[in-house]
Amino acid sequence: MNGQLNGFHEAFIEEGTFLFTSESVGEGHPDKICDQISDAVLDAHLQQDPDAKVACETVAKTGMILLAGEITSRAAVDYQKVVREAVKHIGYDDSSKGFDYKTCNVLVALEQQSPDIAQGVHLDRNEEDIGAGDQGLMFGYATDETEECMPLTIVLAHKLNAKLAELRRNGTLPWLRPDSKTQVTVQYMQDRGAVLPIRVHTIVISVQHDEEVCLDEMRDALKEKVIKAVVPAKYLDEDTIYHLQPSGRFVIGGPQGDAGLTGRKIIVDTYGGWGAHGGGAFSGKDYTKVDRSAAYAARWVAKSLVKGGLCRRVLVQVSYAIGVSHPLSISIFHYGTSQKSERELLEIVKKNFDLRPGVIVRDLDLKKPIYQRTAAYGHFGRDSFPWEVPKKLKY
């Protein structure tokens, strides 16, 4: 059941097909704990002061959470309470799990935003004309292979982790703990630049568990209650390989097993290795940080192009300079899946979207305290967010 120990299983891969793999991590993964705490801090400020300037990094290790960063805000935030509630929600509520929100130490090293940055970016400017908070390049990607316009590999990897959390919280699998990782390999066929998923080739699940449960029971439950509940049956066949709890034991997890840092799961947060990534992380940052707001806008552009039928798969790049409001460059790559040229698509994008941060914030409602929800299971492909609602394009 658990595949060959040497990993790769050379089942015949047909000509014109290829394998692609994406991973995801659960809420209790140490890096994801940090992302969620950073965004909980951001939300706490935005609830009281929608114009708060927040850059909050989190570090987690056994029994300790450290907040470090720069925040300028009119809000009065109880950081101890915000951090502990975030950890409690994730499920680390007892020292037997390796971490406990009630007893962990919360260290705060937060300062004001640099006045040099403030005067260069937003002071004495109309909101529409505020500058980008930093230089950088961001990408948005969309593909017609799923209803969400996301790669199937990352959609399934996220859903497996979400199902683990659901079965842990509702008591169906009481041996589950909050830390988990999943990885999904899909066999694809190329179709004139677009990609068509044919089957799931390999699934990996590693999830933290209590001392009592036996390996066979875990592997059986992961296959029957998690994988079969999440992965459509048409993608599974007798050649699908499963690596379920491949290390054999995963009792020590969360920040006790590994140190955690905000911003170390940027591929999990985006497209699972598809498209491209400019390197900037999302969590703990307000909308003036284009790492976040422009990546959300680029996804909005990409999804609008695909849902509008203008192409089947597309990559959008934007770039910025600190203090400059308009993007320095906008580029569109349609992989040959459009009737229109990339230049024509670029003109449509320029006509329909204003990619200044001070306009993105209005169009996507980015002053609302919605960010903690984005910090697990991916920022894209989930209906509840404004950047996932395609814009009707005029051209």
Swiss-Prot record:
Where are the Phosphoserine residues found in this chain?
114, 384
| Any matching Pfam family | S-AdoMet_synt_N
Family matches, as SUPFAM superfamilies:
S-adenosylmethionine synthetase
Gene Ontology annotations of biological process type: cellular response to leukemia inhibitory factor; cellular response to methionine; one-carbon metabolic process; positive regulation of TORC1 signaling; protein heterooligomerization; protein hexamerization; S-adenosylmethionine biosynthetic process
Tell me the tissue specificity: Detected in kidney.
Which InterPro entries does this one have? ADOMET_SYNTHASE_CS (IPR022631), S-AdoMet_synt_C (IPR022630), S-AdoMet_synt_central (IPR022629), S-AdoMet_synt_N (IPR022628), S-AdoMet_synthetase (IPR002133), S-AdoMet_synthetase_sfam (IPR022636)
| GO MF, one example | methionine adenosyltransferase activity
Extract the PROSITE patterns matched here: ADOMET_SYNTHASE_1, ADOMET_SYNTHASE_2
Record-listed L-methionine binding positions: 70, 113, 258, 289
What EC number(s) are associated with this protein in UniProt? 2.5.1.6
> For Mg(2+), which residues are the binding ones?
31
What this protein needs as a cofactor is: Mg(2+); K(+)
Q: Mind listing the UniProt keywords for this protein, alphabetically?
A: Acetylation, ATP-binding, Isopeptide bond, Magnesium, Metal-binding, Nucleotide-binding, One-carbon metabolism, Phosphoprotein, Potassium, Transferase, Ubl conjugation
Cofactor mode of binding and number, as noted: Binds 2 magnesium ions per subunit. The magnesium ions interact primarily with the substrate.
Specify the enzyme's EC class, one word. transferase
Positions annotated to bind K(+):
57
Where does the record place the region Flexible loop?
113-125
Report the pathway entry: Amino-acid biosynthesis; S-adenosyl-L-methionine biosynthesis; S-adenosyl-L-methionine from L-methionine: step 1/1
Reaction equation(s) it catalyzes: L-methionine + ATP + H2O = S-adenosyl-L-methionine + phosphate + diphosphate
Q: Give the signal sequence positions.
A: none
Q: Where does ATP bind?
A: 29, 179-181, 247-250, 258, 264-265, 281, 285, 291
User: What does the record give as the function of this protein?
Assistant: Catalyzes the formation of S-adenosylmethionine from methionine and ATP. The reaction comprises two steps that are both catalyzed by the same enzyme: formation of S-adenosylmethionine (AdoMet) and triphosphate, and subsequent hydrolysis of the triphosphate.
Q: Subunit info? A: Heterotrimer; composed of a catalytic MAT2A homodimer that binds one regulatory MAT2B chain. Heterohexamer; composed of a central, catalytic MAT2A homotetramer flanked on either side by a regulatory MAT2B chain.
Tell me the HAMAP family matching this sequence.
Answer: S_AdoMet_synth1 (MF_00086)
From the Swiss-Prot or TrEMBL record, give the protein name. S-adenosylmethionine synthase isoform type-2
Species whose genome carries this gene? Homo sapiens
